[in-house]
From Swiss-Prot:
The keyword Ribosomal protein does not apply. Belongs to the MurCDEF family. This is UDP-N-acetylmuramate--L-alanine ligase. It catalyses: UDP-N-acetyl-alpha-D-muramate + L-alanine + ATP = UDP-N-acetyl-alpha-D-muramoyl-L-alanine + ADP + phosphate + H(+). The keyword Ligase applies. One of its GO terms (biological process) is regulation of cell shape. Its main location: cytoplasm. ATP binds at G108, A109, H110, G111, K112, T113, S114.
Length: 436
């Protein structure tokens, strides 16, 4: 019996892939650092064993899958080589796996995770679908027709894939530690477009995506009239969003979604366009759109006393705009408070003015210290450089969150890609202690 061993199983992509292989009735195990990580929950629920790193974990007959963070000199990878066991890097293994299905890569600077989750949910209503989401969620079905997966542009990782379809949500300058500028990002997406085998579903409202050249049909979606799939007559309600879809200027159908903000409409439109292209029954699509419950760390809400607390992964100005817009739509009468932790010094420095502009759309802003990456130096930048660009912004630590209690009936959005959740946890604990 083949045993799949993951070197670095707690990585978000790695844990998702491990879940998929397990669900497909394979024997799966893995190793990693002993520090607890949020991806462990899904692995433990499935009974997948997580071991400490040890060269003795490697045995004859295993299939070794290694995360990109671990060099060839890692003790387990070295042990595999000594036993002449091939080591498959995560992206290459995933690329081979998806070739067995009708694969859909979801790419873009923003909206990948939410769109992948929505796509998988909708397609599941019509046909067996396996999926891999960048939030550490994976689901495998043995007789899958479709394989939906999130494909990240960072370090051009997505060039390991040759999918049947690609959804391209947008092209934006991010990851300034790797990409030189927007043109560098565009060229990565252009290279990806040439690897797609059947069709590309791209947001036509995005100026960069309009320039994409491909060997396959490119179907454009968006709000603009030139798009193949256009959303019109949008009703932004407190219980979701309703809109009409026109296909090449002819009315197609009216859809209701559970999401808020323009970005949620665009994500749904991409999914609707792909399903139309694959001849999935529109009634199935309509029903599945109304039952989608979202993905991890994307506008996740809870109520604490008279306040709404939202946990969101937004860490780029475009994403912050979208999250604050969604909060204003759902809670039009309430004060919106942004608690933001910048992620990496390089990104904060590159987008300093843009961060200030997007955060200013909240009624009140609190800033946590910058969450540095292990890959970078601090440089001269401090959180005060951002604070002075936002009127009334205050600094906050995980020991001073009690200041948030004064926002009676407020909507508190904790945003960031670092450890912003510890600030949220500290505040909730503060409120619970005060209640006793």
């Amino acid at each position: 019996m083949t045993v799949y061993h993951f070197v670095g199983i707690k990585g978000t992509g790695m844990s998702s892939l491990a879940q998929i292989l397990h669900d497909m009735k394979n024997t799966v195990q893995g190793s990693d650092y002993e520090k607890r990580f949020f991806t462990q929950v899904a692995l433990e629920k499935r009974g997948i064993s997580i071991l400490p790193f040890d060269k003795n974990n490697i045995k004859e007959g295993q299939v070794i899958i290694a995360g990109n963070a671990f060099p060839d000199t890692h003790e387990e990878i070295m042990a595999a080589k000594e036993l002449n066991i091939p080591v498959h890097r995560y992206h290459h293994f995933l690329g081979n796996l998806m070739s067995q299905y009708t694969s859909v890569a979801v790419t873009g600077a923003h909206g990948k995770t939410s769109t992948t989750g929505l796509l998988a949910h909708v397609m599941q209503g019509a046909n067996p679908t396996s999926y891999l989401i960048g939030d550490g969620t994976g689901h495998g079905v043995e007789n899958s027709k479709y394989f939906a997966f999130e494909a990240c542009e960072y370090r051009r990782h997505f060039l390991s894939y040759y999918p049947d379809y690609a959804i391209m949500t947008n092209i934006d300058f991010d990851h300034p530690d790797y990409f030189a500028d927007i043109n560098d990002v565009f060229h990565a997406f252009q290279e990806m477009a040439l690897q797609v085998k059947k069709g590309i579903i791209a947001c036509g409202d995005d100026e960069e995506l309009q320039k994409i050249q491909a060997k396959v049909p490119v179907i454009f979606y968006g709000f603009g009239e030139d798009n193949d799939f256009q959303a019109r007559n949008i009703q932004k309600r407190t219980d979701g969003t309703v809109f009409d879809v026109f296909v090449r200027n002819t009315y197609y159908e009216t859809f209701k979604i559970t999401g808020y903000g323009n970005h949620s409409v665009l994500n749904a439109l991409a999914v609707i366009a792909l399903c139309h292209y694959e001849n999935i029954d529109v009634e199935v699509v309509k029903h599945q759109l109304t039952t989608f419950e979202g993905v991890k760390r994307r506008f996740n809400e809870k109520t604490v006393r008279d306040q709404v607390i939202i946990d969101d992964y937004a860490h780029h100005p475009t994403e912050i705009n979208a999250t604050i817009e969604a909060a204003h739509q759902k809670y039009p009468e309430r004060e919106i408070i942004a608690i933001f932790q910048p992620h990496t010094f390089s990104r904060t420095e590159t987008f300093l003015d843009e961060f200030a502009e997007s955060l200013s759309k909240a009624d009140q802003v609190y800033l946590c210290d910058i969450f540095g990456s292990a890959r970078e130096n601090k440089g001269e930048l401090t959180i005060e450089d951002l604070q002075k660009r936002i009127d009334g912004a205050e600094l906050i630590t995980d020991t001073t969150t009690d200041i948030l209690k004064k926002h009676k009936n407020g909507v508190l959005i904790f945003m960031g890609a670092g450890d912003i959740q510890k600030f949220e946890a500290a505040y909730i604990k503060e409120v619970q202690v005060a209640e006793k």
